[in-house]
Amino acid sequence: MAKQQTSPETRSVRLLKVGEQVRHILSELLARQEVHDDVLSAHTVSVTEVRMSPDLRHATVFIKALLGEDEDLVLKALRTNTAFFQREVAQRLRLKYAARLKFLADESFDVASKIETLLADPKVQRDLRDQESDG
């Protein structure tokens, strides 16, 4: 029997959908404190994004420790408990393969904050006003 071909659009939608499901599962596990770790119990952790590899075997999980406290410590605790998270995700999703999770700090908030600071700078504001009056 021939293998069914999927279009790139279908594949990308599936990656997004599975990534979002993984994000919800991990968020729920952390919110309910189902992992028994003192560091994770003491911190509020937000799972901001999950990016799946095209074969769904690897998931990069971006997290943000709320209030920016001890993010390195939280990442270390998450990495220590990776096996627990992988097992829970595999049991709840029932995919062909259990995705290997890789936890990283989400730095997009820091980048956005820097951009906002730059845009609030008086010199930049002046340049923006000059461009509007020229256009």
From Swiss-Prot:
Subcellular location: Cytoplasm
Classification via InterPro entries: KH_dom-like_a/b (IPR015946), RbfA (IPR000238), RbfA_dom_sf (IPR023799)
Functional summary from the UniProt entry: One of several proteins that assist in the late maturation steps of the functional core of the 30S ribosomal subunit. Associates with free 30S ribosomal subunits (but not with 30S subunits that are part of 70S ribosomes or polysomes). Required for efficient processing of 16S rRNA. May interact with the 5'-terminal helix region of 16S rRNA.
Protein name in UniProt: Ribosome-binding factor A
Subunit structure: Monomer. Binds 30S ribosomal subunits, but not 50S ribosomal subunits or 70S ribosomes.
Organism of origin: Novosphingobium aromaticivorans (strain ATCC 700278 / DSM 12444 / CCUG 56034 / CIP 105152 / NBRC 16084 / F199)
NCBIfam families on file: PRK00521.2-5 (NF001802), rbfA (TIGR00082)
RNA-binding as UniProt keyword: no
